[in-house]
């Protein structure tokens, strides 16, 4: 499952502690809409708001089958209240800021993968796509 429809699913999955590849694969296999969402990764260098909204919806589905919301921050709040605050943070979906940076990085990687057969692809700087520089060294942007 290194790649589904040409996208790096493993890269996407690393943000979801406690959620396995099998669960994610089953959810994606059952829903043609989610398959199309992931096929949309890497089409453009910039992550569209529409694609990000769909990635949020997918993330909510991973954490709660009948979430009742498509926004990760709202789902985090609902799950926290449901467990009356007695919840470990790794049982909650990532917050919106964290998920956005992860989606930016996943889109950047996928865009490179989809251009891997081009002789001389033009690849823009990763800064602004979930990475930043710190002390002259490249780093993942942290929320």
What kind of feature is each model-predicted range?
Residues 1-143:
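Extended two-metal-dependent nuclease catalytic cores across DNA- and RNA-processing enzymes
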């Amino acid at each position: 499952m290194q790649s589904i429809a040409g996208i790096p699913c493993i890269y996407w999955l690393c943000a979801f502690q406690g959620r396995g590849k099998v669960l994610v694969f089953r959810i994606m296999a059952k829903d043609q809409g989610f398959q199309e969402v992931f096929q949309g990764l890497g089409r453009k260098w910039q992550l569209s708001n529409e694609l990000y909204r769909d990635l949020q919806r997918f993330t909510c589905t991973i954490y709660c089958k009948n979430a009742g919301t498509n926004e990760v921050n709202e789902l985090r709040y609902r799950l926290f209240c449901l467990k009356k605050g007695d919840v470990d943070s790794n049982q909650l979906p990532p917050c919106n800021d964290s998920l956005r940076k992860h989606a930016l990085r996943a889109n950047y990687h996928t865009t490179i993968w989809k251009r891997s057969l081009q002789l001389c692809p033009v690849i823009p700087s990763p800064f602004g796509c979930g990475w930043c520089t710190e002390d002259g060294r490249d780093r993942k942007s942290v929320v």
